[in-house]
Every structure is written in C-alpha cells, then in structure tokens.
Amino acid sequence: MKAFRIFTLCALCALSAQAQKQYSLASPDGKLKTTVTTGAQLSYDITFDGQQVLENSPISMTLDNGEIWGENDKPSKVSRKSVDGEIKSPFYRADELDEEYNEMTLQFKGFNVEFRAYDDGIAYRFVNKGKKPFKVVKEGVDFNFPFDVTAHVPYTIPRRKGHYNEQFWNSFENQYTTNNITKLEKEKLAFLPIIAELKNNVKLCITEVNLESYPGLYVKPGNGNQLTSDFAPYPKRMEQGGHNMLQMIVKEYEDFIAKVEKPRSFPWRVAIVTDEDEELASTNLSYLLAEPSRLEDISWIKPGKIAWDWWNDWNLDGVDFETGVNNPTYKAYIDFASKNGIEYVILDEG
C-alpha cells in the first residue's frame, strides 16, 4: 500500500511538471529577462542583471461566459521574433527613434499573450482572436516583489471617505506618497505610473500603454509583498454634473469592466527597469509600444508652444480690466502669444 502511494504521488508530480512549462525571453543586451510559466496559472517573473525584480506574478482575464484566460491553458504554439529598426516620431522629442526588442507570442485557443523585452523594460498584453462579442469581467494583474520594497505611489483623492468606487472619478493629480508596500493604505487606489525601489539602485516603474476602449489600471496593496490591480466597472447609469456641469457622473455600475465586439489587442502592461535614475525620464517605451498613427495625412498638424490660462489662474498684471473667463482676458493672451512667438492659446474651460 505504501509503495502504491509513493507511486501515485510520483505520478501526480510528473503530471504537474509536464503540465507546467516555462518559456524565457531576454532583452537585446541580455540584462533583462522574463520567464513565463504556463499550466495551472499563467505567470511571469523579471530579473535584471541576475537580480530578482519580480517574482512569479500571475496574469489572467475573466470573461462573462466563465472562461478565464491564463488558467489551465496550454499554448498550441510559441513564436519568436526580433526587431531592430527605427520608427518615425514627427511630434515627439526626436524625429526618429531606435526600436530594438525581442518578442515572444504564446498562442492559446481564442487568445494570444505577447511579451516584449527591451533593454529598458518588459511588457506584455492579451490579444483576442475570436470574432464573437463578450464582456471582460476582470483582468488579473499582480506584481509580486521579492521583498517589502519601497514604493512611490500617487493615491487618488477620495471625494467621500468610505465610498470606494468614487475613487475612479478623479483628476489623476496628486503628490506621490513613499512607503513600503506592506504599509500602503489598502482601501486607497493609486494611479499610474508608480515606482518601486529594489536593491543596487534598481528601480521598477509600472505603467500601461495603448489604453483604448478599456478602463485604466489602478493598483493597491495585495497579499504580502504584492501590488494587485483594480479597474473601474463599466458605467450602467450616468448623470451630468461635476465641475461646472461638464462631466458625466456614474451613478450605477455594471458587473464587468469592458465590452469587446471584435478581435483586438488589450493594453500593454509595462515594467520599466533600470539602475540609472535618469533613464526613468528618458525611456521611450510608451511611444514605442503605442499603436502607429491612423492618420494618413499629418501635414496639417503644426506643433507649437501654448499660452495657458489655467496655469496662472487667469491672473494678469498691469491690465485695466477684471481678469477671468472673459473676452478681454483672452484678447490679452492672444496679444501676448503673438508678441512672443507663441503659436497657440488654449481656452482651458472658457
């Protein structure tokens, strides 16, 4: 009987090992590496120059038909490619950007998961291949750190304490709070980007790219050394209100976060990793990961500087009229812009 139990246990372990497979992807310079694990739970980790940055972090997407992408899924094919080229960036800080990365696509039934490794970051996204409409009930996005890292997070500013969903109605403006992950406030959401400090001056910046017809990612403390995710539910009923009656206020929510009508790519989940602080500001990953422009003719777009009324609260010195949202104020802004070679004037809410 004892021998039978040992045999059964060994057989189960062998089946588990067979069901679980790992696929690795490295950046072009070899410093950044992610290992993707499939089987019971799709997950990935990140190392930088041999140092653990993220431990196995589960990812998933739950559909309204009960299907969960990323659970008990086995890829039918894994394809790879490398890109080394340039992309045009006519309205960016450079006219052209170098683009170099390695990509790995895991193909599952009905969906793919794409991973990219750049020299300064790792990114992944889900891709829907099916043509039937469905609703996304939940997306699982977790970040499991190897220890209780220090994080810099911008909390949403709650309008009413104790009303959790009202945090989704915010201006995405706040000062950053610095604390260990385990000491972050559990009922407060933080918007992106956030930065985590690891050993040897390694920093990890979490952000997202290509957000379209989908709610933005918020993070909050999870279990242990974990940041987990939350998303604004899809609006069910809205009323006009807010500042100067300019906004639609959600009064009731659906039990899902997004509608999907056709094949599409979902937002990139991005981890920028570096041990040089200035690279956090100079990285071009957000631009490189974004979809190409859909405009065929961009000749009419003329970038330029702007005289901004809101920035100084409509305050003007040396004028003989009362400043505010009125014609004399904007005439003064137009004259100022013309005199100083400023191409545009913005009417923030006038």
For each predicted feature, which ranges?
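An acidic-aromatic substrate-binding cleft motif
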Residues: I257, E261-F336, N340, Y344
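N-terminal accessory beta-strand-rich subdomains and adjacent acidic, glycine-rich linkers
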Residues: K21-L289
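Bacterial Sec-dependent N-terminal signal peptides
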Residues: M1-Q22
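Short, solvent-exposed loop/turn and secondary-structure capping segments
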Residues: Y155-T156, G318-D320, E349
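Conserved structured catalytic cores and adjacent interaction surfaces
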Residues: Y344-G350
